[in-house]
Every structure is written in structure tokens, then in C-alpha cells.
């Protein structure tokens, strides 16, 4: 079965010698509003559709097993060809498995976004689990994720169409799972979001979450 629909859909220019585009999801979204009558009933003739927009998610998979692959993207900066604005990027890693990168974005048919963006980056191992949480990489790490999300605000015109938007604050969230009965020490630049310790029928596992903030 052919999957040629992916060709030419690398909208954020992320595919290269290390990363292959393997999945794409595109959605057409619209909001609707309808008035209610005095008895709480809907009045169908009043229904209005507004704020049409398109969302997209692209997934890339590492096609090499090399360690410390660079992952970098400018969140909030629209692709000049497609018009899509990336608002989040997530790295998922586990053992066994090759790393995957997921990028989500959106665009509108009208209006303009302010050109304010922030560069985000991390490094991942092409194969196996990357430890994004620990001060020193823990060999017992079984899975790790890293997510960068830029806060995005859209405003509508008086008729309900998209009018203007801007991106601003950026948050980095990380998580990891470890073969251990204690959570590892966090990297110095991270703030602890909590941990869970679980006893299984074979090994203890520790799960850890943390975050930090970036300024555009």
C-alpha cells in the first residue's frame, strides 16, 4: 500500500538525514453558536459558524541509532509556504524503540499573527530512552519525554473571524521512568512536579515529572 501522501508535507522543514516523516494528521475546525429561547429551547435559525481554522500534527521517527541527535525548532514562527504556526514540539523515547518527534501547529484563513517566536532545542538518542530529568543520566531510565509549548493567544474580529494572534511564554515539561525504588536527583534548572514509586512483581519503578520556563 502506498503512503505517498506524506511526500512534500514536511511543513516545518524538520525531516533530514536523521529524521523521517512517518505520520501526518490534519483537522478542519470551526466553532458554532446558537441562541436559546425563553423556555431553554435551541433556535436553529440563529446558529452561526465562526473562527474557522486548521490544525496539523506531524510525527517524525529517528532513522539512525546515534546518540545526542539535535532537535530544534522556532515555536510561534509561521512556515512561509504553508502558513502553519508550530506551537508545540514533543520528543518521546523509550527502550526498546527509536525516538519520535511530534510537532503540532495551526493556521487561520484570515488575519495575521505577530512575528514573535522562541527557539527551543534538546538532544535525544536515536535509539533507546533519553533521560531528560536527571542531573546525571541514569542508566536505569526506561522512557523519557521532553515537551516545549508556547502559550498562544488568538483574538476574533467583531464578525467572529480570526483577527490577530500572538505567541508569548514558553514552558518545557519533562518526564522519565526508571528502574529504581527512589526518584533520581533532578537537573539543577528543573522544578519538581512530583514523583511516583511503584512496586511491581519484578522491579520497583520510579516516575518523575518536572518543568522549567523560557523567555522569548
Identify the residue ranges that each predicted region occupies.
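Viral virion structural and adsorption modules
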Residues: 1-3, 211-216
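Extended intrinsically disordered, low-complexity coil regions enriched in Ser, Thr, Gly, Ala
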Residues: 68-72
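Solvent-exposed edge beta-strands and adjacent loop segments
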Residues: 1-63, 77-106, 110-207
